[in-house]
Amino acid sequence: MIQYLKLFLVIFSGLSFLIFGYLCFFSLYFKNEFIRYGIPNFRKTTGFFQSLGGVSLIIGVFIEQLAVIASVGLTILMILGVIVRLKIKDGLLKTMPAIFYAFLNALIFYLFLND
């Protein structure tokens, strides 16, 4: 049962970050959000690491060490996202996705370590 949960969480998070990474490169909304965050120069870098993390999580289904590294990296990335949201005084509703994905990837990390 835990294996199916882990697989679902990895695929869900991996696909989510592939989408987020793509949007960082091509979405006007995301471009404007990074301007609002005060870090417009980090948009493409963030998109790259989100895409890399998403791909690595999915490949990590077969190469577990890669999933462990990706889940740690994405957890850190989302913690940084929470910090940015706090810095610009975004409300809880706008901060919740970053909190959710930070916890999700921390859980994925935990599940791989305790397999």
List where the protein language model places each region:
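Membrane-interface extramembranous regions
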Residues: 2-115
